Amino acid sequence: MGVRKFVPTRSAAPVPGARVLGLTIDSEFEVAQHIAAGFSATTIGRLARELGVPDKRMLTLTNIPESTYFDRKRRNKPLSAETSSRVYRIAKATEAAEAYFEGDKDAARRWLINPKVSIGGKTPLEFACTPEGSDYVIKLLTRMEHGIIS
């Protein structure tokens, strides 16, 4: 018996957040590498457009000063790993909301930008900026999908 080449019959599940950020990646390991290296500064604008919010709002959410953002963008320098991580968490929550609303980006955006009692009157977008907050937003969407009132 000879050695046979493995040919996968299915592709891997998409990596959460990758589509929104325009990343062509196959694993969360690659996400971690991209975050460590720093996303392109233009990623913030891309995410802002996806959510229909001004770039300035995204800068506030990701805690990056305008001057730093424009300097990095102008000099084609990557975002810090910390900022890239915040951007990724928002992207993951965005994709989770879009999945919950069955691809209706407007409904997902409205849900993300409107305050919710279940998260202390904050918007899911604001809450998604920390690892725990992002996880909570995604779990909240999962509970809603299964009819569990939060």
What label would you give each PLM region?
Residues 1-150:
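Non-transmembrane "mature" sequence context
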